[in-house]
């Protein structure tokens, strides 16, 4: 698998994400600039956490206009795999890759803590190394992580199996306890928890490693569950 991490001005999880994918999961992973307009060399493109362009206006609202986003739309439309984590999730919703929106947390506070998740769909490119019902603990760090969608969209997400991760104890008010969703075709995932911060036992556990191992399995056809 060859992956790219888009490093926007204000991104602060780009190096962490590259490290998790390259040094822990063992895949190729480049950092690329938001001015890049050709993504055809990659199997997976990752949009990291942080505060892209200072999150002025609102989270992800400026990053969505970066030149790389047009290339990312073409990449996703051609079936390439895209994952947005935290601010990356916000960027993907702003740019229309994913349904719904991320609002201020229910209590209007920035939340930085480990949270419990359950795996709702283990049949995606991002979750095939888990099993339905698996309990995960991943860190969150966000002020605008409260997932909102209208009732019709929420019903479609549930019916289509697009909810991949769900909070066990909802920390931020997200509707249906949603922590991570895919697009309708299943090749784009947005999630607020940070899997890249949970890939080593010494640093908070390895529950997030399965996200990256799933992508390796999807793109290379190699089941790497034994490495977890």
From Swiss-Prot:
Q: What is its EC number?
A: 6.3.5.3, 3.5.1.2
Example GO molecular function: glutaminase activity
Keywords for this protein? ATP-binding, Cytoplasm, Glutamine amidotransferase, Hydrolase, Ligase, Nucleotide-binding, Purine biosynthesis
Q: In which pathway does it act?
A: Purine metabolism; IMP biosynthesis via de novo pathway; 5-amino-1-(5-phospho-D-ribosyl)imidazole from N(2)-formyl-N(1)-(5-phospho-D-ribosyl)glycinamide: step 1/2
One GO BP annotation of this record:
'de novo' IMP biosynthetic process
Q: Give start-end of the signal peptide.
A: none
Task: List the catalytic activities from the record.
Answer: N(2)-formyl-N(1)-(5-phospho-beta-D-ribosyl)glycinamide + L-glutamine + ATP + H2O = 2-formamido-N(1)-(5-O-phospho-beta-D-ribosyl)acetamidine + L-glutamate + ADP + phosphate + H(+); L-glutamine + H2O = L-glutamate + NH4(+)
For this record, an example GO cellular component is: cytoplasm
The task this protein performs is described as:
Part of the phosphoribosylformylglycinamidine synthase complex involved in the purines biosynthetic pathway. Catalyzes the ATP-dependent conversion of formylglycinamide ribonucleotide (FGAR) and glutamine to yield formylglycinamidine ribonucleotide (FGAM) and glutamate. The FGAM synthase complex is composed of three subunits. PurQ produces an ammonia molecule by converting glutamine to glutamate. PurL transfers the ammonia molecule to FGAR to form FGAM in an ATP-dependent manner.
The UniProt subunit note reads as follows: Part of the FGAM synthase complex composed of 1 PurL, 1 PurQ and 2 PurS subunits.
**Protein name as annotated:** Phosphoribosylformylglycinamidine synthase subunit PurQ
Species this protein is from: Lacticaseibacillus casei (strain BL23)
């Amino acid at each position: 698998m060859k992956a790219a991490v888009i490093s926007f001005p204000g991104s602060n999880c780009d190096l962490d994400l590259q490290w998790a994918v390259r040094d822990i999961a063992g895949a190729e992973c480049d950092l690329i600039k938001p001015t890049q307009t050709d993504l055809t060399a990659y199997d997976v493109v990752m949009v990291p956490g942080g505060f892209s362009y200072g999150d002025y206006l609102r989270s992800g609202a400026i990053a969505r206009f970066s030149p790389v986003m047009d290339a990312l739309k073409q990449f996703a439309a051609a079936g390439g795999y895209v994952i947005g984590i935290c601010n990356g999730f916000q960027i993907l919703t702003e740019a229309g890759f994913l349904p719904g929106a991320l609002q201020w947390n229910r209590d209007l506070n920035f939340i930085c803590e480990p949270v419990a998740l359950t795996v709702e769909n283990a049949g995606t490119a991002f979750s095939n190394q888990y099993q339905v019902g698996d309990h995960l603990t991943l860190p969150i760090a966000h002020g605008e992580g409260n997932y909102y969608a209208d009732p019709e969209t929420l019903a479609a997400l549930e019916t289509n199996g697009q909810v991949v991760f769900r909070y066990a104890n909802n920390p931020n008010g997200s509707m249906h306890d949603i922590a991570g969703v895919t697009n309708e075709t299943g090749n784009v995932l947005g999630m607020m928890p940070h899997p890249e911060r949970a890939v080593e036992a010494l640093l908070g556990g390895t529950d997030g490693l399965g996200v990256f191992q799933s992508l390796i399995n999807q793109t290379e056809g190699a089941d790497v569950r034994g490495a977890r």
